[in-house]
């Protein structure tokens, strides 16, 4: 269940606006610009939903990396693709092993969003730029998924997989930053 808590800032804002009331001859205080803070609690997802999402990310990363090895022009992009291919083969194998223990097999198909991204990448005229832009999106999405599940996942069997994948994706994001 998604819970969003908005921190109360109304009382201080009202107090400040009351203090800003007209006085004799002094400068008027400007109302404070107050932006409420939004805190989003971790979203609890099932083990099955985690396996499905994580396997689609791994599959997208492997397929896009294979495409990059064929189409990329910049040698640094190819080096990044080799790294991402190897690391996601590893995370995919770990996910598959842990998933089997729970009778949850990773999907062999991309989810519709990842399939659309792969199709767009395949059609891109400036492949290297498109590849790097998509990597930034997918790696950040993956990091959020794995980090959230590592902290509050429903499966003790999958939490260590998520913790490892979180570390791998942090390293991959850093490699992406260096390659730009």
Task: Provide a role label for each language-model segment.
Residues 2-8, 19-180:
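His/Met- and acidic-residue-enriched segments that coordinate or traffic transition-metal cofactors
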């Amino acid at each position: 269940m998604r819970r969003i808590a908005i921190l109360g800032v109304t009382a201080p804002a009202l107090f400040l606006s009351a203090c800003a009331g007209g006085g004799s001859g002094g400068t008027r205080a400007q109302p404070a610009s107050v932006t409420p803070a939004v805190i989003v609690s971790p979203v609890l997802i099932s083990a099955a939903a985690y396996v499905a999402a994580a396997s689609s990310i791994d599959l997208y990363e492997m397929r896009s990396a294979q495409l990059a090895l064929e189409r990329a022009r910049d040698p640094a992009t190819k080096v990044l693709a080799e790294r991402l291919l190897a690391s996601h083969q590893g995370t995919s194998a770990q996910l598959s092993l842990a998933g089997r223990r729970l009778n949850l097999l990773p999907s062999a198909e991309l989810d519709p969003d990842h399939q659309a991204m792969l199709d767009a990448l395949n059609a891109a005229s400036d492949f290297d730029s498109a590849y790097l832009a998509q990597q930034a999106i997918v790696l950040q999405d993956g990091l959020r998924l794995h980090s959230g599940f590592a902290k509050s996942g429903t499966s003790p069997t999958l939490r260590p997989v998520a913790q490892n994948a979180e570390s791998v994706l942090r390293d991959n994001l850093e490699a992406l930053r260096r390659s730009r």
